[in-house]
């Protein structure tokens, strides 16, 4: 995970500035560390014929696919998520999928937009990571400046139409006392994956080797730590890829939509 530098963090201290930098092409990388205190979202953009099934998939799998916004058909805006927000330009980098294959990674999708597309914004773990760090829980992948480790599991999502497949999880190594606190903190944030779905014993959820993540980068685990697993926003991208729609767009990994919604608004209790 590429952490935004101190100078860049100051420049991108608010969501509008971060989206403007994405829109004008001056920022095309990961958004971790930008606009601290505000919700960042994963994106899935699909033809309207698939929208109802994908919505059902998200509703049936809220841990992996916590919805924070949906656009009207053909609209590149989700007013609840931001002033002057344009889905076509305000994400640093996108992924375009054709028949389940990665076709391009553009920084602007204006020329690909159509009146038939529906946008789904899905909660991102950057929000709960900020809460963990604010409460004194260190995260090694953040400290070391690389992406979080993510794994396919043997936990099957509840299918909907063409969308099905295993849950993808992210892993953060924590000392036992910190793991307990992490459960307490993240359970209050169901809109960004909520509490962990599993702690320890990776083989019991189908993960054979923590040193070989399916996505992201390996993260060292110290002898006094245990792996803590959260449902991950890569899940919807993986099931979209497996469903092989003729056309779909997602965000590129780590390149999120930065919204105007405060993280505090996601705290459920």
Curated annotation (Swiss-Prot):
Q: Has the keyword Zinc-finger been applied to this entry? A: no
Question: What is the protein name stated in its UniProt record?
Answer: Putative hydro-lyase RL2444
Q: Name one Pfam family in it.
A: D-Glu_cyclase
Q: Which residues form a coiled coil?
A: none
Q: Name one GO molecular function term.
A: lyase activity
Which Gene3D superfamilies does the entry mention?
PSTPO5379-like, PSTPO5379-like domain
NCBIfam families per the UniProt record, alphabetical: PRK05463.1 (NF003969)
Keyword Lyase belongs to the record: yes
The protein's enzyme class? lyase
| Similarity-based family | Belongs to the D-glutamate cyclase family.
UniProtKB keywords:
Lyase
Identify the EC number(s).
Answer: 4.2.1.-
């Amino acid at each position: 995970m590429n952490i935004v530098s101190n100078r860049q963090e100051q420049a991108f201290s608010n969501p509008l500035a971060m989206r403007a930098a994405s829109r004008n092409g001056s920022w095309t990388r990961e958004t971790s560390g930008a606009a601290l205190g505000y919700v960042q979202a994963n994106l899935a953009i699909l033809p309207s014929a698939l929208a109802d099934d994908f919505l059902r998939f998200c509703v049936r799998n809220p841990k992996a696919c916590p919805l924070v916004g949906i656009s009207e058909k053909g609209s590149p805006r989700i007013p609840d998520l931001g002033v002057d927000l344009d889905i076509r330009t305000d994400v640093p980098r996108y992924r375009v999928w054709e028949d389940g294959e990665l076709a391009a990674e553009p920084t602007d999708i204006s020329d690909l937009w159509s009146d038939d597309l529906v946008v789904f914004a899905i909660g991102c773990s950057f929000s709960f990571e900020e809460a963990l760090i604010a409460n004194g829980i260190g995260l090694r992948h953040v400290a070391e400046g690389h992406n979080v480790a993510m794994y396919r599991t043997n936990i099957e999502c509840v299918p909907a139409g063409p969308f099905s497949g295993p849950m993808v999880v992210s892993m953060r190594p924590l000392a036992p006392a910190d793991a307990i606190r992490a459960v307490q903190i993240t359970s209050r944030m169901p809109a960004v994956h909520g509490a962990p779905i599993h702690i320890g014993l990776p083989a019991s959820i189908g993960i054979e080797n923590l040193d070989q993540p399916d996505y992201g980068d390996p993260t060292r685990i110290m002898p006094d730590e245990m792996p803590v697993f959260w449902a991950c926003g890569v899940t919807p991208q993986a099931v979209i890829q497996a469903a092989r729609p003729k056309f779909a767009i997602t965000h590129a990994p780590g390149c999120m939509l930065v919204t105007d919604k405060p993280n505090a608004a996601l705290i459920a209790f």
